[in-house]
Amino acid sequence: MKGKTVSAALVGKLIALSVGVVACTQVKDETVGVGVLSEPHARLLEIAKEEVKKQHIELRIVEFTNYVALNEAVMRGDILMNFFQHVPHMQQFNQEHNGDLVSVGNVHVEPLALYSRTYRHVSDFPAGAVIAIPNDSSNEARALRLLEAAGFIRMRAGSGLFATVEDVQQNVRNVVLQEVESALLPRVFDQVDGAVINGNYAIMAGLSARRDGLAVEPDASAYANVLVVKRGNEADARVQAVLRALCGGRVRTYLKERYKGGEVAPAL
């Protein structure tokens, strides 16, 4: 009887020990923060979140309303990475704010376009028409090049990726260029004759570059939206896992099915 009791106790200890070993081998999910602005970035990260969860990475998606705050959060280490901008915009931030941000890879492109509630064709705009454009220099330069391609203006030779209205050499159509914060462009859209709107804000306003744009950026490849980190974190396994998920099959399929008009397309 005593022997049976000892044996039972021993078995109990062995079971407890085995349970403890199993518990110790369970991998705890690691939380990592990534900052975004809005559509489509937040939705793409939700898809990526499901993918990296399989690798025990818990993605904490933090939405911001300001470009600069997003980059400053990465610089401070509040979040590990952000996903909202293209390389020229990132370079502009680094230059103006003594930043040290780098891109770890292209994800998608969002063509810039000229929209109007009043006119249906570029040729319809009269002299004196007011056209709103983004006021941050990287996107302002994109807008100016688009307006140049559409015949509204001519830019000074060599004006580059950070051109401003000061680089307009000739106002061919005598339009008024009104600089507006990118996030506010959809709001002022009804108050001006036309507006050159960033892809993500156009989407939020229910606009499609291919369907509604009077002039559409022909090649947005230089402005692919990228995943950004502070220099030194490029090889972080969590960053690379998120990048793979954002460039993976599920995200590419979503983009093709959700944005059939090409408003957002996977980067090549």
From Swiss-Prot:
Predominant place of localization: membrane
Record keywords: Cell membrane, Lipoprotein, Membrane, Palmitate, Signal
A Pfam family reported for this protein in Swiss-Prot or TrEMBL: Lipoprotein_9
InterPro entries: Lipoprotein_NlpA
Gene Ontology terms: cellular component: plasma membrane
Family matches, as CDD domains: PBP2_lipoprotein_Tp32
Lipid modification (S-diacylglycerol cysteine), residues: 24
Membrane recorded as keyword: yes
Membrane topology: Lipid-anchor
Annotated signal peptide: 1-23
Protein's UniProt name: Membrane lipoprotein TpN32
Annotated source species: Treponema pallidum (strain Nichols)
